[in-house]
Amino acid sequence: MSIPADIASLISDKYKSAFDNGNLKFIQTETTKTKDPKTSMPYLISHMPSLIEKPERGQTPEGEDPLGKPEEELTVIPEFGGADNKAYKLLLNKFPVIPEHTLLVTNEYQHQTDALTPTDLLTAYKLLCALDNEESDKRHMVFYNSGPASGSSLDHKHLQILQMPEKFVTFQDRLCNGKEHFLPTFNTEPLQDAKVSFAHFVLPMPESEETVDEDLLAMCYISILQRALTFFQDWLNENPELKKSYNLMLTKEWICVVPRSKAFSDEMKIGFNSTGYCGMILTKNDEVFSKITEKPELINDILLECGFPNTSGQKPNEYNY
């Protein structure tokens, strides 16, 4: 697993060059930190009109694979990771939600509905370890939007990596604070915050990076993914069109899976991917930005509309695990 020691500066230099040359678009007009008065869930709401230009799912011409095309101006590392050290490439996101937003892309075409492999997970975790910097308070998150209702816009398998906003504490951080790493059993469920509306499954990660390997990551991922996928069995009668979709988020501190029922809220004309389910809300529309900054409790309702009801306190057999 050879991730260059200077990976942070490689990303930074490539981003500066791509930004200066107009190869990517980043325009953020306003950011507001707020909190839901009922659930205490913290939100960082960013208004980003530049995202209007980002293609949505279904807008890419059939048969086209934008992530398969070589784009030297966006490529940080063309080949690394995996058994042959050629399994992945690291690209800059053409439509970054924060500066230096990157994509971990499989060099061989795989589908975004495919499960993550142990190698995918370990490569992502190693990137987190290389990029996080306690001295400068830099912390990163990897996320994977899988399935048509997850907020993913491209079919070529890719994970995304972004730096967490400074001093932003997610509800997953609070949930795992002071908790030791564990794997769920029939008697011990993954963590859920009973106050938030939507189903989510969270496990604390081990404190020591050295104890984290492919097996541990795969066991964490599979155990919470299985619980998320039970919702699709339970709800198929009610909604036969439902396609398996979920968001996965991984930091050095925790791993989280959120099952998804819809990519967009009909109620509010806003879409979410993984970032929304840890409180980072992106808006393209002025009216939506005004509404949710004035009444942040609306976000809890629309996150539920696009997810499934919270099962906190229920045993697996109570939701057909």
From Swiss-Prot:
The gene is APA1. Disruption phenotype: Inactivation of both APA1 and APA2 promotes a great increase in the cellular concentration of bis(5'-nuceleosidyl) tetraphosphate nucleotides. Ap4A phosphorylase catalyzes the phosphorolytic degradation of bis(5'-adenosyl) tetraphosphate (Ap4A) into ADP and ATP. Can also use other Np4N' nucleotides (where N and N' stand for A,C,G or U) as substrates with equal efficiency. Cannot catalyze the reverse reaction. Additionally, this enzyme can also catalyze the phosphorolytic degradation of adenosine 5'-phosphosulfate (AMPS) into ADP and sulfate, the reversible exchange reaction between inorganic phosphate and the beta-phosphate of a nucleoside diphosphate (NDP), and the synthesis of Ap4A from AMPS plus ATP. Optimum pH is 7.5. Keywords: ATP-binding, Cytoplasm, Hydrolase, Nucleotide-binding, Nucleotidyltransferase, Nucleus, Phosphoprotein, Transferase. Monomer. The active site is at H158. This is Protein APA1. GO terms for molecular function: ATP binding; ATP:ADP adenylyltransferase activity; bis(5'-nucleosyl)-tetraphosphatase activity; sulfate adenylyltransferase (ADP) activity. The N-terminus is blocked. The record marks Q160 as: Transition state stabilizer. One of its GO terms (biological process) is nucleoside catabolic process. Substrate binds at K54, N93, K94, N145, G151, S152, S153, L154, Q160, N273, S274, T275, M280, K284. Its cofactor is a divalent metal cation. The modification Phosphothreonine is found at T60. GO terms for cellular component: cytoplasm; nucleus. Residues 50-70 are annotated as: Disordered. Belongs to the ATP adenylyltransferase family. Its EC number is 2.7.7.53, 2.7.7.5. Its main location: cytoplasm. It catalyses: ADP + ATP + H(+) = P(1),P(4)-bis(5'-adenosyl) tetraphosphate + phosphate; sulfate + ADP + H(+) = adenosine 5'-phosphosulfate + phosphate. It is an enzyme of class 2 (transferase). It comes from Saccharomyces cerevisiae (strain ATCC 204508 / S288c) (Baker's yeast). The lineage of its organism: Eukaryota, Fungi, Dikarya, Ascomycota, Saccharomycotina.
